[in-house]
Regions:
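Glycine-rich dinucleotide-binding loop and its adjacent helix/turn
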Residues: 1-71, 106, 167
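Short beta-strands and strand-loop turn motifs
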Residues: 49, 55, 77-80, 224-227
Length: 243
């Protein structure tokens, strides 16, 4: 997102394996290391890293926060909604919130990020829309991703209301010679029959196999997904399924 100060060193996103390696290098090699953001050319003052702020309270955000706690960081998780794990009912989310707080994650809910700035000592400050300031030595953005459909649009493929590529049961797009699978597509919800975006590894794996079957001449088809999701945190698990 185009937030003020987002290109400061020490601010990372979590989307690719290189992103994860950059975070590890920043932590392990010390602060005299560029964050990898492409619009900033400075260095942060050399100092121990003990404070982390994670932006986003879904899968990646919570799992990242847990790993930072295990690395000895004081972790604050900032989420613009009034709960973590939005698919959960609020009373269930409260159980998760209480559990992770007992294990060292400080939650700042119902408060969006307004921007970032660098303090005089070289550390970072996360500014929120409520006016609060969260000091940090590393900031990790775990805000989720949108389907990358630029190529599909250029090819004239049908794009759904949720922003994904529309496919049929055999993973064919609106052009029958072009197949699409994975996080960039819209699929039918197994329960409601409505179009949905399901960014999960299990369905993506199955879709790839079905597309390969169809290309090879087999009559395989994707029957939809229930979006079953499970997250493990500090030895416990939370899960949900259905519409």
């Amino acid at each position: 997102p185009p937030l003020p100060g987002i290109d400061l060193p020490g601010i990372f996103q979590v989307r690719t394996v290189p992103d994860a390696r950059a975070i590890r290098d920043w932590i392990e090699r010390g602060s005299l290391f560029l964050s990898g953001m492409d619009k900033y050319s400075g260095f942060q003052t050399l100092r121990p890293k003990t404070r982390a702020v994670v932006i986003g309270g879904r899968f990646i955000g919570l799992e990242t926060a847990e790993n930072l706690v295990h690395r000895g960081f004081e972790v604050t998780l900032v989420e613009m909604l009034d709960q973590v794990l939005a698919p959960l009912d609020q009373d269930m989310a409260r159980i998760v919130e209480s559990y992770v707080e007992r294990h060292g994650i400080r939650l700042a809910l119902n408060d969006g990020v307004a921007g970032f700035q660098q303090a005089a000592n070289g550390s970072l400050e996360v500014l929120t829309k409520s006016g609060k300031v969260h000091p940090a030595d590393i900031v990790i953005l775990a805000l989720g991703v949108r389907p990358e459909t630029a190529l599909a649009k250029t090819a004239g493929l049908a794009i759904g209301e949720r922003g994904g590529i529309r496919v049929d049961e055999q993973m064919r797009t609106s052009n029958p010679d072009i197949f699409a699978v994975g996080d960039a597509i819209e699929v039918r919800d197994f329960v409601t029959g409505e179009w949905s975006l399901i960014a999960l590894a299990g369905p993506a794996n199955r879709q790839g196999r079905i597309a390969a079957d169809v290309i090879a001449g087999r009559q395989s088809r994707f029957r939809g997904t229930q979006g079953t999701s499970i997250i493990g945190l500090f030895g416990a698990a939370a899960a949900w399924v259905g519409a």
